[in-house]
Amino acid sequence: MGRDKALIEIDGSAMIERAAISLATANLEPIRIAVAQPEDVEEYGSAIGPDLDIEWVLDSITHAGPIDAIEEALLDPECEDGLLQLATVDYPWASSDLFFSLQDMLGADDCLIMPHDGERGHPLLSLIRTKEVLEIIEGDRRPLRVQFAEARHSVLVEDPAILLNVNTPADLE
């Protein structure tokens, strides 16, 4: 791509900052941000600013992908037997309202709740039960969309504009 999408600015804020502020506003601090290399901490940290409670986690396998990063997070003892809100910088319009709605709508028997835009699910914005989802994804490298659809889950239908996935500045045009 050539440019780090986390640092693409929308309305004067980097996409990583927008994601972190939305999570913090939804009372989801500390926010754990996985980075590929130590230099990313300084660069992303300066884009986010010092006011949020951020825990930086270095990927054990550089650029391994979201499934490995999620599995690694779920293996952390601090994440066991609880809830974890997944979020990526790819969704700059995901707001605290979305995260609150996911919290409110998660069913008692659900392993997760996934936002849906009417055409497809968005697993990287799911609210997950850590123990159950670890059992689902551990060692399975099929797409998360497939794995999560097979799990006991709820769907939160959301405005497609909120779930617009941005990977390059051209996606904003």
Feature roles, as predicted:
Residues M1-H122, T130, E135-R141, A149-I162, ...:
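Nucleotide and nucleotide-moiety/phosphate-recognizing core
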Residues E173:
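Acidic two-metal-ion nuclease catalytic site recognized across multiple nuclease folds
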